[in-house]
Amino acid sequence: EYNTYDNRYSRIDESNFKNYINKSFNLSYSSMDSFYKCPFRYYLSHVLKLDIYEERFEAYIGSLFHYVLERALKEKKSIDDLVKVFISTNERVLTKKEKFFVNKLSRELNFIYDTIVDQLDSSNLKNMLFEERVEVIKNGDISVTFKGFIDKIMYEKKDNSTIIAIIDYKTGHTDINLGYLPYGLSMQLPIYLYLAKNS
């Protein structure tokens, strides 16, 4: 009818979708988590690529922690010196409030580092990989690249097998509830284990 509009959702045509993505697709834990939280936002962000990326302060702090801990463990450098290097080489201009939090969290980094060193001393897994990119490619009607970045993998080769531990650093509070797994939630560590095993 003239001047009418139907706001009901109509599915995307499958062949149009395959052509749009060029029959290939990237998946990660964060994109899957985004889908479970809001499929429409996932569609806008990961399919149509309409997201305008702005680094939030939380992401900045996460990058700071990863940078400092990796280099402190590998190169045995001072935590305070590494924090200064990160701040000076990062383009973000910190507000006074952000500087206050960075200084406060920097002191906590020393405690975290000491705790990690104690854990390493009591572990039999002596080999480490940092910020390891892992991916598994599944070919079919659509080629899917399943990828992830694992903060740290500790491993030891024994006989014909390899024992691994996957570590993911969190700067915020995260609930890990295995009861959520059947619903596709709290999947980060199982996904990383799958990627590490199959890549």
Which residues are covered by each model-predicted region?
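Active-site-proximal structural scaffolding
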Residues: 10, 25-28, 36-37, 58-62, ...
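Short, well-ordered loop/turn and helix-capping segments at boundaries between secondary-structure elements
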Residues: 48-49, 53, 70, 74, ...
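A non-catalytic, helix-rich entry segment at domain boundaries
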Residues: 64-139
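Short intrinsically disordered, low-complexity coil segments enriched in acidic
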Residues: 1-6, 100-104, 191, 199
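Non-catalytic protein-protein interaction segments used by genome-maintenance enzymes to assemble
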Residues: 127-197
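Active-site-adjacent bridging/hinge elements
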Residues: 36-47, 80-84, 154, 160-171
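C-terminal, charged and often intrinsically disordered regions of DNA end-processing helicases
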Residues: 1-71
